[in-house]
């Protein structure tokens, strides 16, 4: 997946250099389709952060496309790779005694709609120098929480550290706001912040309130990663009755903050493709000449 995103970024970076020999006046016909690349930070909200706070800032990278339906409304699609991390050692209350931690590499694909505060202008190059927008949509998330033990990294979901199964593919609802800054007729900079509501409490592999009975867990690795209090001598004599592991009443979520470069694609790209496609179709359906 990382290689796919890198290849996509290289392709997007090359687009502005295609057809640069033509003047602006030759290309000023309206453009409604944009491509983008961006980067920023991601942070998560769940059991391994202080109440009302977010976790450590981790990097993300995104590619996307956007189409303007009219001067205010647009539809967009984005593919984002990001990391999340949580650690009880950073807790400012008694949760440090739980001694749990996780890190994960995640992939999100989302389809969203955006609305601008002010119209973009009759032509794309007549848009205002600064505009504010809001967006919302729906997406799908792949996440894979992992933890280290004795110098090795283990994926937690297959181990079922709480004795429960859950899917690593979940729907998400992204919502957020942003600002669009015009660099020149063809380029924008977006500064955006968006929160993702999820339908799972397992981004960090922690959910149930009480520790599970060790006898129901798969193996010794699962048992050790399920209850890590013995590593710092905080384990009670009866772990299934004493101590809180998670909070199943609240779902996990994450926040993405990005700076994105957008480029308006010329219509000639699509027109040339249509001409080539139609030419091939005509050649395919052309009847053979009689001898």
PLM feature spans:
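Extracellular loop and loop/strand-boundary signature of outer-membrane beta-barrel proteins
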Residues: 45-51, 94-102, 159-165, 244-247
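Outer-membrane beta-barrel "beta-signal"
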Residues: 110-114, 250-291
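Gram-negative (and chloroplast) outer-membrane scaffold detector with strong preference
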Residues: 73, 78-150
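Short glycine/proline- and aromatic-enriched beta-strand/turn motifs that initiate or cap beta-hairpins
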Residues: 21-66, 145, 252-258, 262-268
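Residues on the lipid-exposed face of transmembrane beta-strands in outer-membrane beta-barrel proteins
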Residues: 37-39, 63-67, 111-115, 136-140, ...
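Outer-membrane beta-barrel strand-turn architecture
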Residues: 29, 67-71, 117-121, 142, ...
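Residues that define the transmembrane beta-barrel architecture of outer-membrane proteins
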Residues: 31, 55-59, 105-109, 130, ...
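Repeated loop/turn-to-beta-strand initiation elements of outer-membrane beta-barrel proteins
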Residues: 72-75, 186-189, 267-270
């Amino acid at each position: 997946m990382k290689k796919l995103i890198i290849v996509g970024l290289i392709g997007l970076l090359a687009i502005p250099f295609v057809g640069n020999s033509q003047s602006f006046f030759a290309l000023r016909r309206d453009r409604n389709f944009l491509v983008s690349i961006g980067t920023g930070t991601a942070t998560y909200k769940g059991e391994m952060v202080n109440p009302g706070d977010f976790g450590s800032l981790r990097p993300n990278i995104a590619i996307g496309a956007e189409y303007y339906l009219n001067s205010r409304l647009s539809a967009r699609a984005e593919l984002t790779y990001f990391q999340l991390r949580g650690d009880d050692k950073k807790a400012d209350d008694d949760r440090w005694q739980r001694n749990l931690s996780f890190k994960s590499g995640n992939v999100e694909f989302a389809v969203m709609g955006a609305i601008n505060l002010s119209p973009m202008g009759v032509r794309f190059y007549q848009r205002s120098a600064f505009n504010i927008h809001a967006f919302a949509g729906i997406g799908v998330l792949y996440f894979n929480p992992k933890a280290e033990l004795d110098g090795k990294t283990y994926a937690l979901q297959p181990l079922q550290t709480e004795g429960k199964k859950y899917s690593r593919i979940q729907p998400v609802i992204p919502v957020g706001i942003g600002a669009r800054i015009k660099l020149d007729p063809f380029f924008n900079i977006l500064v955006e912040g968006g929160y993702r509501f999820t339908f799972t409490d397992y981004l960090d592999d922690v959910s149930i309130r009480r520790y599970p009975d060790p006898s129901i867990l798969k193996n010794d690795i699962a048992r050790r990663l399920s209850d890590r209090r013995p590593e710092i001598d905080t384990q009670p004599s009866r772990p299934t009755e004493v101590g809180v592991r998670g909070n199943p009443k609240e779902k996990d979520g994450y926040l993405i903050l990005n700076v994105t470069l957008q480029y308006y694609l010329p219509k000639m790209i699509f027109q040339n493709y249509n001409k080539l496609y139609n030419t091939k179709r005509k050649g395919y359906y052309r009847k053979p000449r009689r001898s």
